[in-house]
């Protein structure tokens, strides 16, 4: 769990694997990833059946990632470069800064979340979107919604985050 911080060789290998998975450039990794993803999806279906629910559509990170990356790159005034990464400087708005593209050029959850808002709107043309997550990421969502207000103003205006938990 600490190899990324304690072992430079391991850290480089982790970066290589992450990049290869994102780019789908390694057939062996692709097969492992696809199998693991399918096992997870199948198991989720058993949980959904237990609680008698279903979903009409699934949105995957792999769909959102290239859209988020392009969005960040096309808005350098919102996401300036910092140490090879693209960041949103939240401090300017009383928030904290977040990385949207890492120094390898890979989109982070933040960039994917921006793209997800767009994908969801294109799919269902929503009037209001409620995103419910654990309250531990309330501050993350404040930054995300502020960044969204600059690139997808209309979506930010109709997106609400609700944090829950104990």
Q: Which stretches of residues belong to each language-model region?
A:
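NTP-dependent nucleotidyl-transfer catalytic core
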Residues: 1-166
